[in-house]
From Swiss-Prot:
Residue stretches of biased makeup (Basic and acidic residues): 344-353
Residue segments, region Disordered: 326-386
Entries under InterPro entries matching the protein: DUF3654, UPF0329
Family named by the database record: Belongs to the UPF0329 family.
Compositional bias ranges of the Acidic residues kind: 354-368
Protein name: UPF0329 protein ECU04_1670
Extent of Basic residues compositional bias: 330-339
């Protein structure tokens, strides 16, 4: 095992652009095992936010002036970033002779590669995923018929290292000379691999596979599903763990993973694209190198196989149901009474329904509920009972009419709500009047939907914040975002009190700030400085909507829906909030 250091030159320059005129330097360190290599994901972050996806074209970037400013340096030096991630920096970043040799023999070549691919990106229609693959191909030149620049640079490095071994300073002690000799010999051995075209061909092949898979994932998922996938991994990023908060917040960087590339390539050849896609998803979710071995790959392959089997079975059931419905329609059209064939079909439908109920028992299900002045309790409590929450009056207030809400806010202590117009309150009621979320929050499997972003202290109270990815449909608009739940513990009972509940509209780009502990700037903007702990809480289990208000909660395999209907016309949907299930971690 050896330490490798990625020289993050992009950090220094972005700090100059965004922070001050004083240049700063930073580096990220990581450990690689024999056979392991750093592979870059085709995602670019600015601070905690994703600004470039595998599918992003240059024309997409031009719409966001700030992103263009932040990305200018990285895109102009993409080959340097790839080199820094891939090559052990101890062989070219010693602050002396080896670094000068890199400047003389390699820097100009990498500059040329970067400028060429940037020109290609600006003037063409390639995605960032395709661009990154081209950078790898041109940097390592594995298919070149000419002498590779990397190999020529390696020859110069070996000669320089040999000279350094032979001409050690006389004033050094024998112990110091021995250590220096050992380090230089290790570097020499590593540099010899620059001639190993097959090794670097594998690196390029693995990078291409990961880039193409990431692009497939982005194209194959709904935006909210992709947002959920990236949100889960946002707290597990390598660079976030290696660098400080202030350093990360002003940095442009690509995400990467350390992985055994031979293992990854073998898995792709043996199991195919579906298993590779799931493996890459798990890496994006935060699966680390030491967790990925042959046994784990087999586990992923079995999970993919089982998912495929269930999907095929579900399709088969739907086809049978369509055939039965078609047969019923024909029978009605002919005006016949129930025939033997229809009875048999009914019996078959009943049997299949019973089978479905048994199979559904494998997953946690929650019954639908309709609320219209009274709660209809159905289903059994899970072992240990449902989770208990209390509701703060500032959350309960949103169930009232806009006029009543305005009256109470104007008399209240929260300045940010005082003086709001009725129109503003009506707009905000759409995002805050989502009490049906408590049905999910209290359920035994709430953790399958909500992510805990951590505890933090504000206004003298310790608080917890949870978020879930969702889609809110209202007034003909479909809005992507997160459901935010803020709680604190009631004293002395210790029962969590929900004091903040809302749907926040945000896209993939702004998701990083939303996911930060304490909510980052976005969370702080909506958070209450000091909570009015007046004990006027209501037990969530006893909450009942006012008469005339109707909503239904529907729990499905991958989502939870709250549907608000028109009391005068139940077929008319006024609003629908769909909360996505968190992606499965294998």
């Amino acid at each position: 095992m050896r330490w490798k250091y990625a020289a993050w030159i992009l950090i220094a320059v972005v700090d100059v652009m965004c922070c001050s005129s004083e240049e700063k330097s930073a580096s990220v360190s990581f450990v690689t095992r024999p056979g392991s290599q750093v592979i870059a994901f085709p995602f670019i972050f600015v601070g905690h936010s994703i600004v470039v996806l595998p599918t992003t074209k240059y024309s997409n970037l031009k719409r966001n002036a700030k992103s263009m400013e932040d990305l200018t340096f990285l895109l102009s030096n993409l080959s340097h970033v790839v080199w820094s991630l891939t090559i052990d920096s101890t062989v070219y970043k010693d602050g002396g002779r080896l670094e000068k040799l890199f400047d003389k023999r390699m820097r100009g070549y990498l500059d040329g590669v970067s400028l060429d691919v940037l020109r290609m990106y600006v003037n063409g229609s390639k995605t960032f995923s395709e661009l990154l693959q081209i950078v790898y191909e041109r940097t390592f030149e594995c298919d070149s018929r000419r002498s590779r620049q990397m190999a020529r640079y390696g020859e110069s490095l070996i000669r320089e290292i040999d000279n350094m071994i032979e001409s050690m300073p006389a004033e050094m002690s024998e112990e110091e000379k021995e250590k220096m000799r050992s380090d230089l010999n290790n570097n020499r051995k590593y540099v010899e691999s620059f001639h190993d075209t097959e090794k670097w061909r594998q690196v390029v092949e693995a990078e291409k596979m990961v880039c193409n898979t990431c692009k497939e994932i982005c194209l194959g998922l709904k935006e909210e599903e992709l947002m959920g996938l990236l949100a889960e991994g946002s707290a597990k990023k390598y660079i976030k763990a290696s660098a400080g908060e202030s350093e990360v917040s002003s940095t442009v960087y690509p995400e990467y993973i350390v992985v055994d590339i031979s293992l990854l390539l073998d898995a792709h050849r043996e199991h195919g694209g579906d298993v590779t896609k799931e493996l890459v998803k798990q890496m994006l979710l935060g699966k680390k190198e030491e967790e990925i071995d042959k046994r784990y790959i087999g586990k992923v392959a079995n999970a993919v196989k089982e998912r495929r089997r269930r999907g095929e079975k579900e399709i088969e059931k739907r086809v049978k149901k369509l055939l039965r419905d078609e047969e019923k329609a024909k029978s009605k059209k002919r005006g016949k009474r129930k025939s033997v064939g229809v009875s048999e079909a009914k019996e078959e439908e009943k049997k299949e329904s019973e089978t479905e109920e048994v199979e559904a028992g494998e997953e946690v299900e929650m019954p639908s509920e309709e609320v219209g002045g009274a709660r209809r309790k159905t289903g059994k409590k899970s072992e240990g009972g449902r989770k208990r929450y209390k509701i703060h009056r500032r959350v309960l207030r949103w169930r009232k009419s806009p006029e009543k809400i305005k009256e109470e806010w104007d008399k209240g202590s929260e300045e940010r709500w005082r003086g709001k117009s009725l129109e503003e309150i009506r707009e905000q009621k759409v995002f805050h009047d989502i009490m049906g979320v408590l049905e999910l929050l209290r359920s035994p499997d709430a953790d399958r939907f909500f992510m805990d972003t951590g505890d933090y202290t504000k206004g003298g109270s310790e608080r917890q914040r949870m978020v879930a990815i969702g889609v809110l449909e209202s007034g003909g608009k479909r809005m992507l975002g997160v459901v935010e739940v803020g709680t604190f513990k009631d004293c002395p009972s210790g029962c969590p009190v929900v004091y903040h509940l809302m749907f926040r509209v945000t896209g993939i780009e702004g998701m990083g700030d939303v996911m930060r502990r304490g909510g980052g700037n976005l969370g702080e903007a909506s958070d209450v400085e000091k909570i009015d702990e007046d004990k006027e809480y209501q037990d969530a289990g006893k909450f009942v909507y006012p008469k005339g208000v109707t909503f239904e909660t529907v729990k499905e395999t991958g989502s939870f829906q709250i549907v608000w209907g028109n009391p005068s016309n139940t077929s008319e949907v006024l609003r629908r909030l769909t909360i996505q299930c968190r992606p499965c971690v294998i």
